[in-house]
Swiss-Prot record:
Organism annotation: Bacillus subtilis (strain 168)
Highest taxon in the source lineage: Bacteria
Protein name: Catabolite control protein A
UniProt cross-references to CDD domains, sorted A to Z: HTH_LacI, PBP1_CcpA
Key words of the record: Activator, DNA-binding, Repressor, Transcription, Transcription regulation
Amino acid sequence: MSNITIYDVAREANVSMATVSRVVNGNPNVKPTTRKKVLEAIERLGYRPNAVARGLASKKTTTVGVIIPDISSIFYSELARGIEDIATMYKYNIILSNSDQNMEKELHLLNTMLGKQVDGIVFMGGNITDEHVAEFKRSPVPIVLAASVEEQEETPSVAIDYEQAIYDAVKLLVDKGHTDIAFVSGPMAEPINRSKKLQGYKRALEEANLPFNEQFVAEGDYTYDSGLEALQHLMSLDKKPTAILSATDEMALGIIHAAQDQGLSIPEDLDIIGFDNTRLSLMVRPQLSTVVQPTYDIGAVAMRLLTKLMNKEPVEEHIVELPHRIELRKSTKS
């Protein structure tokens, strides 16, 4: 049966439409026997409450928008899983949209979701500009960033301390005796790379009294192919690095394979550390040492923070930093 309305359910259960509405919205002020009668009528008629219509009455649609840069990325799909699990726990539905890391599309999706009357948005994106921040401020509903960096720290966010994470990885390589350490970064247009990761790299070198060599910084785009290209560039230099830190595991795989194609042995000739601890780190030989970013937890905590903001619960920290660690495997000398 199609187009069953709340009126049909009320008539079938012999109750008022207000009572049906209270049952559908989980209002406790309904007698158990009446609730049972209404739920049975809903089941019999196949009634599906319309989230937006319910939202007009309750001012809530129990729907959350999630904007993701690359739906095919192992990293972002794991983040989305954390978001989804907590959303389900708190009985929120999710609208998931892929932005292709395109600013215009991100801003368009933001407005599209607000038009769908979502109760809140989890936003993931590499390059958060002043335009983004202005849109976030204009939003009538809360927005939380997940694994994303906004330099002014005005928008609630959940991530790790990326500057410290890169610093720790470089320091580990310094402590292993390396003095020629290269860094394969993501796009420098993105604050996460320019303001956080690159600064961590520079700080670790400075504290070890090692010079910063601009040629040892190769800019990639997070992909396997850009890892291949980075290694080819670094090995074409007169002075070659003895260790490479990659801003993602996927680029690190490209680095390892390109090095092996050149006849280099990992880790005997070159120590390599990745970043993110995606399952790719276990699929390569030698298995990849990597900075562990608690991806699933970032998604889960971001969604929980959003539920608090949507329900106007007290929030102690708007900028949440989760712990990171380094998992040493076989791509670094023991």
